[in-house]
Amino acid sequence: MHVVILGSAAGGGVPQWNCRCSICSLAWAGDSRVRPRTQSSIAVSPDGERWLLLNASPDIRQQIQANPQMHPREGLRHSPIHAVLLTNGDVDHVAGLLTLREGQPFTLYATPGILASVSDNRVFDVMAADVVKRQTIALNETFEPVPGLSVTLFSVPGKVPLWLEDASMEIGAETETTVGTMIEAGGKRLAYIPGCARVTEDLKARIAGADALLFDGTVLEDDDMIRAGVGTKTGWRMGHIQMNGETGSIASLADIEIGRRVFVHINNTNPVLIEDSYERASVEARGWTVAHDGLTLDL
């Protein structure tokens, strides 16, 4: 199984377009300690030829250009991207669908709830129905979006997208609006969970034994954005677990066997983005890799 992390940042990327927090300021200045990062997306292939795109970032055209595996290869129109799978309806995961509207056939997969958030917004009708097939997938149903890749979706604690929030919103609920994915090929297993509000025993049992885990790395501490002075929301309020602390992802997942542990979907205010920082060293010392754009895994 071949895995490419096309975009490793959370919504807005690094640096964010209007942000001068300490981390974004380093990125704007071209400081080599903070790599620029695009918004959350990965691609997976069983053979290096046919690819499944997981989440369609607003930066997808830039991501395709930066990764030769994703380039058109034949004829006047072509793409090695055969299918797209959404793990939630967040803007940073669906807006890139508008870029994929240029008459290229593929199948869009998501749970009924996630797909409804796309179908109910007519702007996505630019993806012609006779070109882009929309396929609903039930939780815990195994399907094959690309020959040789078996995928199963499962609920994880989360919340509805920001643009669908209302007074009835529940943070940490396990529904079909935020899902994890287990991808299998050639006897290898990859768990991809870019958004998760907390780690449950069911989640640990689901991903135990995976050869690699790509997990929500939005915030180091629950109050990262508040500390940075650029926001008032906590990680929990946004539906994202913190890395540190007794109930954080590092401690919560420490007792299960997993091959490689990689943080993705990293917010611009997370200090692990600074490569020579104490925070980065601390995370790496506990067995985790901080993803960057273009990071590849061969399982």
Swiss-Prot record:
Pfam families: Lactamase_B_2 (PF12706). It comes from the Bacteria. Gene3D superfamilies: Ribonuclease Z/Hydroxyacylglutathione hydrolase-like. The keyword Transport applies. The keyword Transcription regulation does not apply. GO terms for biological process: pyrroloquinoline quinone biosynthetic process. Pathway: Cofactor biosynthesis; pyrroloquinoline quinone biosynthesis. InterPro entries: Metallo-B-lactamas, PQQ_synth_PqqB, RibonucZ/Hydroxyglut_hydro. Belongs to the PqqB family. May be involved in the transport of PQQ or its precursor to the periplasm. This is Coenzyme PQQ synthesis protein B. It comes from Methylorubrum extorquens (strain ATCC 14718 / DSM 1338 / JCM 2805 / NCIMB 9133 / AM1).
